[in-house]
From Swiss-Prot:
Domain SET: 110-227
Gene it is expressed from: SET2
Domain AWS residue range list: 52-108
Organism this protein belongs to: Debaryomyces hansenii (strain ATCC 36239 / CBS 767 / BCRC 21394 / JCM 1990 / NBRC 0083 / IGC 2968) (Yeast)
Record-given protein name: Histone-lysine N-methyltransferase, H3 lysine-36 specific
Key words of the record: Chromosome, Coiled coil, Methyltransferase, Nucleus, Repressor, S-adenosyl-L-methionine, Transcription, Transcription regulation, Transferase
Length: 731
């Protein structure tokens, strides 16, 4: 026996330690972090399950009146969602509200408390016995992308944080419970754990839970293997104390034992940890050559696995693993197992457990990485049994295959996808029984034609392993007008539907006046048996009574259908009226707001005008300009123009002085003649001529004085070609 095998045997024989006397430290532990009720997400896409279509099971509601609970989709059922690690939804599943497969949503956690351990800090203790495969707690924290994860790893390492709180949700999403999380963060590591982590699809998100690996006793510490999906900045010594302890946990460089496949994956691949350890022992040299230190699985081992076709018991394991796995090597092996499966009944089971939806997501995830993988998936889809196109349509896989056919450059993929689309195009949609049609009522139909009415209160999930043959009702009678029959592959029975009325039922519809039961086809001729009180009248009465009852039942059905239609129409009308009312209210509100805005604007403008008017009225009016000032202004417009020609000789300053003196003289003359007469707006030509003549006379006198005074200077300038004199006007 190898050392590894001996450790495994010791681990199995090991009696777990109980912490019944340890003090409850839950409140104290809660003070060390911020407790979250739900995971938070750094973006909308972070932590996405990748399942854009809702995964619905095919179970029926199973109401327990004593417990007042819907017991559908329980642990012992064959709910296709539960076996593939998908939680049911009240909104989309047909199993009724609040089924047993909503443990994450309802927070159905085990009874646990936090305790103080000797070497490992806080730990999580079971307060009562926990049975195998039970949901213990959800691992909650901040869901971040890979870039943020890398940054936080460095940051926490710098801050010397030694505890591990990162969990890999998927290859690009990580849960960080370092600062914010739930009590699940206190689960310690063990090399021989009593629990394991598993990823479940809940709505549009992938969530992580801790589940019991075996029966857990009251007082046991709950532990799982940190080396599966959990990360820390540095490797740490392990203090689990188990016989098979590998001494170290976490860090970038994983030990061989740390790279063992998770339980669900190894089962789906059809291998055991014992086989994997044996392979590691024999091929240890391959690890350093064929994979990097960042790998989280033994890649060489996965590639070496020789897979086989699926058995019936393998279906849920493989499909559940395929829905959650992101590693290409593992995906290739899982697809290979489905590819090797040729049994139609097993392939039908694969289709039932979300086969089309799962392969659709696999194609989307790896279409650019592995053409051979996509080719195998298309071949698998082509060989699957096809009766209707219902599941093909609901999974939206047809659009994915069309995308391959349109955009792929590979001729083989184009042909496979084209052939598959052509084959799917020939299929028809099957009419489905609407949800909750008569599920909560026993059939009111009388036991006619020698058979009992079909019970409607069926178990939500059919028993596993029972293959029911199609049940065909043998009768020569034609169906009533408007009724048609169809076969339901899920229940292997016929059902009846009326397309015009939009109703369906399990019981065969009968005409308003049903025929009596048929007798045997070939009875031997014999003497009639005489019975007391048995005559033709009595038999006729029974038939008439049955006919009357059946007519009343049909009448009630029609009345109920009519009332239902009226109710729907009334509700629709109410919705329309409500919508119209809301629209009118919205318009009215918008108009009101618009008017209020206009009124406010008017008030603002009026206030502005009022302020402006007030400011203007506060300024005193300017005093009237005196008459002499008005004459000054009038003459000042013309005199400078008359003197401009003298500027070259006497200069600008002298011109300004002459103009000022001349205007002053003219104003004095006007004021002397007519002191009360204002000047006209414009002077006439005669007036302007007089001003011009007077200006000339004034300047002639000024020039005589100016020239006389500057004779000597002017003589000097004339000798050097200097200042030129103004040519006198010729009269």
């Amino acid at each position: 026996m190898s050392d590894m095998e001996e450790l495994d045997v010791k681990a199995k024989q090991y009696t777990p330690q109980l912490f019944l006397e340890s003090e409850d430290k839950t409140d104290e532990a809660r003070s060390t972090f911020n407790e979250l009720q739900e995971c938070t997400y750094s973006s909308k896409s972070t932590g996405s399950s990748g399942q854009h279509e809702h995964m619905t099971c095919d179970c029926y509601e199973d109401w327990d009146s004593d417990k007042q609970q819907n017991m559908a989709c329980g642990e012992d059922s064959d709910c296709i969602n539960r076996v593939t690690s998908v939680e049911c939804s009240n909104k989309f599943c047909t199993c009724g509200n609040d089924c047993q497969n909503q443990r994450f949503q309802k927070k159905q956690y085990a009874n646990v408390t936090v305790i103080q351990t000797e070497l490992k800090g806080y730990g999580l203790r079971a307060n009562e016995d926990i049975s195998e495969s039970s949901f213990i707690y959800e691992y909650i924290g901040e869901v971040i992308d890979e870039e943020s994860f890398r940054k936080r790893m460095i940051d926490y390492d710098t801050k010397k944080l030694i505890h591990f709180y990162f969990m890999m949700l998927k290859k690009d999403s990580f849960i960080d419970a370092t600062m914010k999380g739930s009590l699940a963060r206190f689960c310690n590591h063990s090399c021989n754990p009593n629990a394991y982590v598993d990823k479940w699809v809940v709505g549009e998100k992938l969530r992580m839970g801790i589940f019991s690996k075996r029966n857990i006793q009251k007082g046991e510490e709950i532990t799982f293997d940190y080396n599966v999906d959990r990360y820390g900045a540095q490797s740490q010594p392990c203090y689990c104390g188990e016989p098979n302890c590998i001494k170290w946990m976490g860090g970038k460089t994983q030990t061989d034992a740390a790279l063992l496949l998770p339980d669900g994956i190894s089962e789906a691949l059809g291998v055991t940890h014992k086989q994997e350890r044996q392979w590691l022992k024999e091929n240890k040299h391959l690890r350093s050559k064929q994979q990097s230190d960042e790998s989280i699985i033994n890649e060489a081992f996965v590639k070496s696995i020789e897979v086989s076709a699926l058995t019936e018991s393998d279906v849920s394991k493989v499909m559940g693993a395929l829905m959650r796995v992101q590693d290409l090597n593992i995906t290739q092996k899982l697809i290979e197992r489905i590819y090797l499966t040729s049994d139609d009944s097993i392939n039908s089971s694969i289709i039932r457990v979300h086969g089309y939806k799962t392969l659709s997501q696999t194609i989307k995830a790896f279409k650019d990485e592995d053409k051979e993988l996509i080719s195998k998936i298309l071949i698998i889809l082509a060989k699957w049994p096809k009766v209707t196109r219902n599941k093909i349509s609901s999974s939206q896989i047809e659009d994915v295959v069309k995308d391959i056919n349109t955009n792929s450059n590979d001729d083989n993929l184009k042909k496979l996808s084209s052939d598959l689309l052509a084959e799917w195009g020939k299929l028809q949609m099957a009419y489905r029984i609407p949800k909750n049609i008569g599920n909560d009522k026993e059939s009111n139909s009388p036991a006619l034609y020698g058979r009992n009415a079909r019970s409607r209160s069926r178990s939500r999930s059919p028993d596993r392993g029972k293959s029911a043959e199609p049940q065909h009702v043998e009768t020569d009678e034609a169906l009533p007008d408007g009724w048609q029959t169809a076969f339901d592959p899920n229940t292997q029975t016929n059902y009846y539907y009326h397309a015009e009325l939009g109703i369906s039922k399990w019981e065969r519809p009968i005409k308003e006046v049903p025929k009596g039961p048929k007798g045997p086809k070939a009875l031997p001729v014999s003497e009639p048996i005489q019975r007391p009180n048995s005559n033709s009248n009595g038999r006729s009465y029974n038939e008439e009574e049955l006919t009357r009852r059946e007519e009343e039942r049909l009448k009630r059905e029609k009345e109920e259908q009519f009332k239902e239609i009226q109710q729907k129409e009334r509700l629709l009308q109410e919705l329309i009226l409500q919508s119209q009312k809301e629209l009118e209210e919205k318009k009215s509100f918008e108009e009101k707001m618009k008017l209020e805005k206009l009124e406010k604007e008017k008030e603002r403008q009026a206030l502005k005008r009022k302020k402006l008017k007030k400011s203007k009225s506060s300024i005193p009016p300017a005093p009237p300009v005196p008459i002499d000032g008005q004459w000054t202004k009038t003459f000042a417009k013309h005199v400078p123009n008359f003197l401009k020609k003298y500027e070259a000789e006497i200069g600008r300053d002298n011109i300004k002085g002459c103009a000022k003196e001349l205007v002053k003289t003219l104003v004095a003359k006007e004021m002397k003649k007519n002191p009360d007469t204002k000047p006209p707006k414009e002077l006439d030509n005669a007036k302007l001529k007089k001003i011009k003549e007077y200006s000339k006379m004034f300047m002639d006198k000024f020039l005589i004085k100016y020239r006389s005074k500057h004779d000597k200077k002017r003589s000097h300038n004339e000798e050097n070609g200097g200042t030129k004199r103004v040519k006198p006007d010729v009269e």
